[in-house]
Amino acid sequence: DVVIKAQVLAGGRIVFSPEEAKLITKQTGAKGRICNQVLVCERREYYFAITMERSFQGPVLIGSAQGGVNIEDVAAENPEAIVKKMGFPSNIVDSAAENMIKLYNLFLKINFDSNSAYRQKIFDLQDWSQEDERLHGGTPANFLDVGGGATVQQVTEAFKVQAILVNIFGGIMRLQGTRVDDAKILACDDLDEAAKMVVKLSEIVTLAKEAHVDVKFQLPI
């Protein structure tokens, strides 16, 4: 009893009749994959992989008596197939162990989610923001990156400057009901009105500094 396996980088390739043979699986994409070779072998497979286990933050070896399929499907539909002892015949134990050691030594897997690609430019946001100011003759005093652990007091104190450049790309934390929302100094739905309030606030702070007067103010939120 043998199987014919298409040699493409995708799972779910084993079929049980010619009518099922397709070059399109859920791992190949709609366009499928070009197959240049096939493998004819005995209908006996093992699944073996190395993955990261969160509970102890280290690699773990996964073995299954059902090869050629996604291990996620096996775990959900047939968990007893994931075995603690592989049950290799004695004549292939040494060969299997050697392959496992080689696989472990090569263990490295990086997955990139294409939906997260847009976030990469966020880390350049600081340089871009400060560079724009310098090109127009300004000198940024600070770049504020508000993390998830920022307190209301920290956010409020950080805004005690003469001018504020708020440059937001996407946003990592929610604004509704969060510390950022609680610590806001000015709240205005109209951008023109908000700009006027910022200018007036800046003028007041400037005059106070020139007069060496410590002015405290409170605006309605």
UniProtKB/Swiss-Prot annotation:
The modification Phosphothreonine is found at residue 139. Residues 1-122 form the ATP-grasp domain. GO terms for biological process: succinyl-CoA metabolic process; tricarboxylic acid cycle. It is found in: Mitochondrion. The record marks 1 as: Important for substrate specificity. GO terms for molecular function: ATP binding; succinate-CoA ligase (ADP-forming) activity. Disulfide bonds: none annotated. The modification N6-acetyllysine is found at residues 22, 26, 196. GO terms for cellular component: mitochondrion; succinate-CoA ligase complex. The modification Phosphoserine is found at residue 114. Pathway: Carbohydrate metabolism; tricarboxylic acid cycle; succinate from succinyl-CoA (ligase route): step 1/1. Substrate binds at residues 171-173. ATP binds at residue 5. Its EC number is 6.2.1.5. It catalyses: succinate + ATP + CoA = succinyl-CoA + ADP + phosphate. It holds the Pfam family ATP-grasp_2. Keywords: Acetylation, ATP-binding, Ligase, Mitochondrion, Nucleotide-binding, Phosphoprotein, Tricarboxylic acid cycle. ATP-specific succinyl-CoA synthetase functions in the citric acid cycle (TCA), coupling the hydrolysis of succinyl-CoA to the synthesis of ATP and thus represents the only step of substrate-level phosphorylation in the TCA. The beta subunit provides nucleotide specificity of the enzyme and binds the substrate succinate, while the binding sites for coenzyme A and phosphate are found in the alpha subunit. PANTHER family: SUCCINATE--COA LIGASE [ADP-FORMING] SUBUNIT BETA, MITOCHONDRIAL, SUCCINYL-COA SYNTHETASE BETA CHAIN. Heterodimer of an alpha and a beta subunit. The beta subunit determines specificity for ATP. Interacts with ALAS2. Belongs to the succinate/malate CoA ligase beta subunit family. ATP-specific subunit beta subfamily. This is Succinate--CoA ligase [ADP-forming] subunit beta, mitochondrial. The gene is Sucla2.
